[in-house]
Amino acid sequence: MDPESGIVVDNFSTRGSSGQQLGNIPMKILRDYNRLRPYDLIVLQYGLNVAFEGGVNYSYYKNPMIKVVEHLRKAFPQASILIVGVGDREYRDEDGNLRTMPGVKNLIRYQQALAAETHTAFWNMYEAMGGEGSIVDMVNSKPSMANYDYTHINFRGGKHLAGILFETLMYGMEQYEKRKAYETE
């Protein structure tokens, strides 16, 4: 059913998952999958439900995710891997004001470290959203691009951020091709 050319997307959505469960998929199954559907890019976007208000140390998240990235890299050696950092998530402070949950920024640091330690690409969705308090702006946009839980984007928000990610990937490809052309001159 897939076309011979173009982009084909497979989505392994596991709501509320940290992504660590991917490390438990047997290697034989992943290698069979790679033989049938070899991927060019694997995007890992997990962790939003890992973040919590007082979260400072997310080693318990990062260390198992290192194993997940290594597991996927072994199963899909031809594929590039992109880690998408968590987006903005709000909580109400002691005065009842919406604020970016401090644990979000700490988790992003751990996700960046995960990407660096595994030599994996990283895209900062929090910054792409607009940083501090951006989910509030997405909720209040007309039409709304996020849910009133001030945590989850909706389909419009997903489409908006997908467009930003696409432009980022295309810009990266353009820069790569320019560099390769320069190196061959």
Predicted regions and their residues:
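Conserved SGNH/GDSL esterase-like catalytic core that processes O-acyl groups on lipids
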Residues: 1-63, 74, 152
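Generic hydrophobic alpha-helical scaffold/packing signal
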Residues: 31, 66-73, 112, 162, ...
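Catalytic His-Asp segment of secreted/periplasmic serine-dependent ester chemistry enzymes
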Residues: 88-185
